[in-house]
């Protein structure tokens, strides 16, 4: 199953969400994970309430449980910040104490059919997956928000591509790519994006190496970052250094007569975008010949 850069959304298994991590997006993921995956009704304190797709209806106790906070004030501050950022809308009825929130970026294609009262409309914790808009973290970047760990984690996940012909490295396994010319990344680039120092970026990848292994390229080219846990229908082993270097070598060979200005990282990113299609075709031809033999 491909995950092309042009796709507007990516899949995120609820089981993979790093619930221990800090950052505003972990609260968003908690809320999204408990929202209704299809239209229906739900009971709260004897009342039957209509629940729309991507919404949740309940009380403050339930909300605090979802967010895993103890104080009402803390829960409402989180909801206010998420609403200010445009990730949710919510209302709290002062008379009935019923709180309703709706995920603004809900992907309707992932929703099931409407169901009648008595059937389950909410998801089971740690089961299934969320459909996340690929650009969901961009507003944090645009607002100059300093990322938390969960924000950075989701940022990498939502910029995962797989078998995209503009990135030959993604034919080995799901890889992280920011834009057409950003398949090879540097710690400095990510630090600038997340408002982190380089050493903090390095510690992040050391801690989350089970999710996002780094593969350093020679010199000052940068790193290829893979997403080890992204769901595919293929069995993807971790790419070996030999496989990655083979692709890099082919890209450089095909780009040897191509002149472009800029630092090494800028140049290699252009070469990857320009030459990946030819490299992929060559590797597929080699594989076909081996199969015939």
Task: For every predicted segment, state its role.
Residues 164-165, 176-196, 232, 253-293:
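Append "and, occasionally, other polyanion-binding protein interfaces
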Residues 105-143, 232-271:
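Short, amphipathic alpha-helical interaction segments positioned at domain boundaries
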